[in-house]
Amino acid sequence: MHAVRYSQAFIPTLKEAPADAQVASHKLLVRAGFIRQLGAGIYDYLPLAKRSLAKVEAIVREEMDAIGGQEFYLPALHPAEIWKESGRWDVMGDNMFRLKDRKGGDYCLGMTHEEIFTAVARDELRSYRQLPQVWYQIQTKFRDEPRPKSGLLRVRQFTMKDAYSFDVDRAGLDRSYEDQRRAYEKIFTRCGLDFVAVQAHSGSMGGSESSEFMVRTDAGEDLVAACPRCRYAANTETATSRVAAEADGPGLGTPEKFATPGVVTIEALEQAPYSVAARRQLKTLVYMADEQPVIAVVRGDQELNEAKLQTATGAVAVRPAHPEEIPPLMGARAGSLGAVRFTRARVLLDPSLADRKDMVTGANEDGFHLRGVDVRRDVLAHGATLAELRTVKAGEGCPRCDGTLDVFKALEIGHIFKLGTKYSESMKATVLDAEGKQVPIVMGSYGIGVERILAAAIELHHDDNGIVFPMAIAPFHATVLTLGPEPELRKAAEEVVAALGKEGVEVLFDDRDERAGVKFKDADLLGIPIRIAVGKKGLAAGNVEWKLRKGGAVELVPVGEVARKAAEAVRAAT
């Protein structure tokens, strides 16, 4: 195997990270010469990055092929018509890069490929005998990310492995989904990632069920609620919890209005002379679900989760109502709103409030609130319905056992979906079943962010000196360097490099005319798992220095044994 000589390689390392780099992976990928920024959310992948990404892709391919996946390569440029068939041309909004050709035709750059793969299935699959099918590709995707940041964690151009399963029924989908879940677990384990699979929100993808694969890191932008006792885990967009019961007073026979001039926040109502604790307040929020008003009610000390509201309403998109949209509907401005006996729009109430009494809420009149509200009598009895709306908090009870939930930041590295017939029905992708009836194909969709695996590995595996790569995705298995300029050291190093190559070990040979300290520092920065140093004193005794990047003392290894030792280390870790 051919070694790469550092003196001839393009490895533009930097002493300092860019000023705008906030997370470890961004800082280190730039400093170690893996990436350079071309524009907001757009990166050049330099040779070291390309080597590591190729290894990630190879692992993904192996595990996809192992479950019967067949690799495609479909266009990144899509005509608008195919997205309009599924109804997602408008749903994707500003997140989609759109363009026109010279004839005025509408096109987009693909964010994902459900529509394109469904079109292939529609045109080519005719019978249940052709199913199941598992198709995948590893391809460039585009997303007009509004706030690109954090290096490779939030970008506008990225590489995705997207796979799609096609089955004749739900039972087949369940099997395909579990095959993908197991394959994902193998992929992430092989890439050196500690991960957790969590229940997730399907968003614009649709479907009946989805799971995200998350890496716990402060660089993540998702929040996961997990129980260490029973291993329940869910994105907070879907997570539920047990909330301690509140001891309410008997309340009043009917709600009583009282003046609250200038009081428009939960916090203000907590202050004297009112002194109403936030947990005794009803927070009433006005949203637009597919541009239709909906009222969401949570406890005053809780936060509304918009993903849960979207799920509860079944809407394609939800947004907070604009200030000018609220008074014509509610009769008051935000800060004085309530849902008592309100019937002019759909009202959704978090289940934790169902049996609350003696609550306080806005009176739908500026400067006034109501006390003594009985939720069941004054809200639910007038047409409101219960729906999971609140965001769970750390310390709340696990919904599955007596444990308590931990809530932590996490980074999504993969997402799998049971799409069902969402796309096949809208795009008329059908097959004949065993009884000769035309039925819509039952689909699943399964995505992995290739660059995110690289970035996540660095977030998990780094120290003050640089990257600490897992062996399987390191750009090289080993680096060989000399500790002096003497010709005999160079000759011995060349022989070690050749022996490593014969054993299949990928080597970066640091043949630069630099001090040993510089070479050691760069080796640590690049994160190459094995460092082999050839020095005068050790060589005189027939040894070379051996050190693992992930820690451990320097060992002296006989020159004739170092290649075998390295090969064994590589095999054990990959």
UniProtKB/Swiss-Prot annotation:
GO MF: aminoacyl-tRNA deacylase activity; ATP binding; proline-tRNA ligase activity
Record-level GO BP terms: prolyl-tRNA aminoacylation
Family annotation (InterPro entries): aa-tRNA-synt_IIb, aa-tRNA-synth_II, aa-tRNA-synth_II/BPL/LPL, Anticodon-bd, Anticodon-bd_dom_sf, Pro-tRNA-ligase_IIa, Pro-tRNA-synth_IIa_bac-type, Pro-tRNA-Synthase_IIa_type1
Compartments reported by the entry: Cytoplasm
Record key words, sorted: Aminoacyl-tRNA synthetase, ATP-binding, Cytoplasm, Ligase, Nucleotide-binding, Protein biosynthesis
Gene Ontology CC terms: cytosol
UniProt catalytic activity: tRNA(Pro) + L-proline + ATP = L-prolyl-tRNA(Pro) + AMP + diphosphate
Lineage: superkingdom: Bacteria
Coiled coil feature spans: none
EC number from the UniProt entry: 6.1.1.15
Location (main, coarse): cytoplasm
Domain notes: Consists of three domains: the N-terminal catalytic domain, the editing domain and the C-terminal anticodon-binding domain.
Family to which the UniProt record says this protein belongs: Belongs to the class-II aminoacyl-tRNA synthetase family. ProS type 1 subfamily.
Cited HAMAP family: Pro_tRNA_synth_type1 (MF_01569)
Self-association and partners: Homodimer.
Summary of the function given for this chain in its UniProt record: Catalyzes the attachment of proline to tRNA(Pro) in a two-step reaction: proline is first activated by ATP to form Pro-AMP and then transferred to the acceptor end of tRNA(Pro). As ProRS can inadvertently accommodate and process non-cognate amino acids such as alanine and cysteine, to avoid such errors it has two additional distinct editing activities against alanine. One activity is designated as 'pretransfer' editing and involves the tRNA(Pro)-independent hydrolysis of activated Ala-AMP.
Cross-referenced PANTHER family: MITOCHONDRIAL RIBOSOME PROTEIN L39/PROLYL-TRNA LIGASE FAMILY MEMBER, PROLINE--TRNA LIGASE
The name this protein goes by in its record: Proline--tRNA ligase
Gene of this entry: proS
